[in-house]
Amino acid sequence: MEQLASLLLHSRTQAHSFHVGVKGVGALSAHQALQHYYDTIGGIVDGLVEAYQGQYGLIKLQPVSGLDTNNDIKNIIAYFDKLLVAVAKLREDKKLQMSWLQNDIDNIVTLLYQTKYKLVNLQ
């Protein structure tokens, strides 16, 4: 959970960084999609972490690498693809198998795919 929570909380900041720097063809739709992502992800992750901590105790967030400053749409889409792969792997943790935790993770995956859809198709 520590790695998953850290990655997702960092993704909010990364999406905000992409949001303020995106330009070119498709920038307006990307700008809006990224804003929706960073406005939404924090609340979902907060609920997931609080539920987990209610069951297992407090977690310690892990270090995450710095911000990606490449604001090209293709790079932003690749970033979300990497997040989807990471979440798919990290959600397999034995302590995350309770249905209420998996439901929150499902909501995170839904948000990731919605954001990717908007980045790819609404240019």
Located regions from the model:
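Disorder-to-helix initiation segments
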Residues: 1-11, 69-76
